[in-house]
């Protein structure tokens, strides 16, 4: 009955060139969605779209800098022009905490104006732009639709990385507020909240390749004892985007190996 969870749906996925976004694009397409892959890194993004097409799926690749409202609007417009409508947007693009020249995470007071502006522009404004563009299109179609955002467990509890956590905390609350506001229009809004995760940019997207001993130590901090893989949050995003979650809105789903269970 649920072999293809998004059969015939049209979806936009930001940050689709790597990590969770890439895995989500492949999964959504595997489950029948027609996907607009939207990423600022054109070569990686084209590769994702090519993989979908090679597997028999439908995909469009667009360059999208989520800090530019026009780019986000254009990604939604491409879904409509290519596939006739928009059913799902997965606002996944994001960046991690700013780093020092030595490769460590900057403390809160070390963050420059440029660091602050970059995190707010990508992690907050980029998601806001995606939500706004999707809502406008959903209303043109008569209502109904799904918004999924990538937040983080860093936005759900206090533990270092205050600047990054603040940007993700904004998205945590955004889902709750929008879910209440948009529920009468049958528009669902939910977040997937990864914990420590290995991506193309190292652990947690920090751009630092950690030795195995450090990875093992981080894994031990999680009750399930292992680091999150990008496909795992992508699978939760697939569920939230599908009709299996028809009566689920306004929630933040931790994919963290059990870390939040102890908070």
Residue ranges and their predicted role:
Residues 131, 167, 175:
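Active-site helix of classical SDR
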Residues 152:
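Residue(s) in the substrate-gating loop at a strand-loop-helix junction
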Residues 136, 180-184, 246:
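Alpha-helical segment proximal to the catalytic Tyr-Lys
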Residues 100-108, 112-117, 218:
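Substrate-binding pocket helix/loop in short-chain dehydrogenase/reductase
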Residues 1-3, 105, 237-238, 249-263:
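Short C-terminal tail/terminal secondary-structure segment
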Residues 183, 188, 193, 248-250:
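Short, small/polar-rich loop/turn modules that mediate ligand/substrate recognition or access, typified
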Residues 3-36:
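Canonical Rossmann dinucleotide-binding motif of NAD(H)/NADP(H)-dependent dehydrogenases/reductases
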């Amino acid at each position: 009955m649920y072999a293809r969870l998004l059969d015939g749906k049209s979806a936009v996925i930001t940050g689709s060139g790597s990590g969770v976004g890439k895995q989500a694009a492949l999964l959504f397409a595997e489950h029948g969605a027609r996907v607009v892959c939207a990423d600022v890194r054109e070569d990686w993004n084209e590769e994702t779209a090519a993989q979908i097409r090679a597997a028999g799926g439908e995909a469009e690749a667009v360059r999208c800098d989520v800090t530019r409202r026009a780019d986000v609007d254009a990604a939604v417009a491409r879904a409509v022009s290519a596939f006739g409508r928009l059913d799902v947007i997965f606002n996944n693009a994001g960046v991690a905490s700013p780093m020092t020249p030595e490769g460590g995470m900057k403390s809160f007071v070390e963050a420059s104006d440029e660091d602050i502006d970059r995190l707010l522009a990508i992690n907050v404004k980029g998601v806001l732009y995606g939500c706004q563009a999707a809502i406008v299109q959903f209303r043109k179609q008569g209502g109904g639709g799904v918004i999924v955002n990538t937040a983080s467990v860093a936005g759900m509890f206090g533990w270092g990385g205050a600047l990054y956590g603040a940007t993700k905390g904004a998205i945590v609350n955004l889902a709750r507020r929008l879910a209440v506001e948009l529920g009468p229009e049958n528009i669902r809004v939910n977040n997937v909240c990864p914990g420590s995760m290995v991506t193309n940019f190292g652990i947690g997207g920090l751009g630092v390749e950690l030795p195995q001993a450090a990875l093992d130590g981080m894994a031990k901090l999680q009750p399930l004892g292992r680091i999150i893989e990008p496909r795992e949050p992508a699978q939760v995003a697939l569920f939230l985007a599908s009709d299996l979650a028809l009566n689920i809105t306004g929630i933040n789903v931790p994919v963290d190996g059990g870390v939040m269970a102890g908070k």
